From Swiss-Prot:
One of its GO terms (biological process) is ribosomal small subunit biogenesis. This is Small ribosomal subunit protein uS4c. It comes from the Eukaryota. GO terms for cellular component: chloroplast; small ribosomal subunit. SMART domains: Ribosomal_S4 (SM01390), S4 (SM00363). The lineage of its organism: Eukaryota, Viridiplantae, Streptophyta, Embryophyta, Tracheophyta. Belongs to the universal ribosomal protein uS4 family. Keywords: Chloroplast, Plastid, Ribonucleoprotein, Ribosomal protein, RNA-binding, rRNA-binding.
């Protein structure tokens, strides 16, 4: 299944706020109206919607998300927590959380078009897994810095999570540590996502 490129507002009306996909938010009460129209949700649908939230927020294909779930399942610790850490440490998401892009699709475009350096080297893979002590910067050219400055100017100034440090005048971000679950910028029950996939096998 390919990455979603359809109407974004349609998704947030059904699933709630997805800040990685769009800065728009559903109207207050729209979630309650949707529930009343469709009646009581089945357990399967609840698990499916949590999975879809994760997929659309991070801009993943179905195959990519399944791959992350399998990697998380083989790691030590809670599968759900490891899954969120893997997704949060993607380069496109780090750029978004630093405020160097307004959405994750915009961050992915910056990476694909070779505007971003990690530790002084161009990285053009949005799924690149960042590590503590990584230094993320814009390329030292006018176009790259102008694009990021535009995002700084147009985006709402969200607080940068504690595992990151932003130096906006240098167009630079630092990864201080692996993210803690309380800094995740999405309202999600990751255990339901893991349960969804465990029931598919």
């Amino acid at each position: 299944m390919s990455r979603y490129r359809g109407p974004r507002f349609k998704k947030i009306r059904r699933l709630g706020a997805l800040p990685g996909l769009t800065s728009k938010r559903p109207r207050a009460g729209s979630d309650l109206r949707n529930q009343s129209r469709s009646g009581k949700k089945s357990q399967y649908r609840i698990r499916l919607e949590e999975k879809q939230k994760l997929r659309f927020h991070y801009g993943l294909t179905e195959r990519q998300l399944l791959k992350y779930v399998r990697i998380a399942g083989k790691a030590k610790g809670s599968t759900g927590q490891v899954l969120l850490q893997l997704l949060e440490m993607r380069l496109d998401n780090i750029l978004f959380r630093l405020g160097m892009a307004s959405t994750i699709p915009q961050a992915r475009q910056l990476v694909n078009h070779r505007h971003i350096l990690v530790n002084g080297c161009i990285v053009d893979i949005p799924s690149y897994r960042c590590k503590p002590r990584d230094i993320i910067t814009a390329r030292d050219d006018q176009k790259s810095r102008a694009m990021i400055q535009n995002y700084f100017d147009s985006s709402p100034h969200e607080e940068v999570p504690k595992h990151l440090t932003l130096h906006p005048f240098q167009y630079k971000g630092l990864v201080n540590q692996i993210i803690d679950s309380k800094w995740i910028g999405l309202k999600i029950n990751e255990l339901l996502v893991v349960e969804y996939y465990s029931r598919q096998t």
